A protein has these predicted regions:
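Strongly charged
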Residues: 2-34, 38, 46-160
Length: 160
């Protein structure tokens, strides 16, 4: 039995300077590639500016649209492969909240990258607007994951 207290493994990433939001800071960190945080920050802020312009609002409307989009894309269940006996089963499992937001961010970035707009900021903006309205590739991906979990619900008793 260890003599010292357990170490908290979750790092505090703080909040972003413009919106004061933990969610936006996390999104910037996931957009970031090769440690280029200023570039990631400018991409995300350009996307928020485009969203605000499209919604005829300010930063608060853009942030509200982003939070709504993330809520629309977050999965509740996912499937995990588990070997039981001679076969491999796709077992539906619940998704923790932290993983759900991370998956939502990844899917939004992935589907924005596959769009054909000129800049990444515009692609992200269009994906945020589409996801907030309930359509778009990221929402489709979430629905596919949920459909897969529903199809394999018979194997849910294998989760342990």
């Amino acid at each position: 039995m260890p003599r010292r207290k357990s170490v908290n493994l979750v790092r505090d990433i703080g909040v972003d300077p413009r919106f004061g939001s933990y969610l936006v800071q996390k999104f910037i960190n996931i957009v970031m590639e090769c440690g280029k945080k200023n570039l990631a920050r400018s991409i995300v802020y350009d996307a928020f500016d485009s969203v605000a312009k499209k919604l005829n609002g300010d930063d608060k409307k853009a942030l509200a649209a982003f939070e709504k989009a993330v809520g629309q894309v977050k999965p509740f269940v996912e499937v995990k492969s588990r070997r039981v006996g001679g076969g491999v089963y796709q077992i539906p499992t619940e998704v923790r909240t932290g993983r759900a937001t991370t998956l939502a961010f990844r899917w939004m970035i992935e589907s924005a990258s596959s769009r054909s707009d000129k800049t990444m900021g515009l692609r992200l903006a269009h994906e945020i607007i589409d996801a907030a309205e309930g359509n778009g590739n990221a929402v489709k991906k979430k629905n596919d994951v949920h459909r897969m979990a529903e199809a394999n619900r018979a194997f849910s008793h294998y989760s342990w």
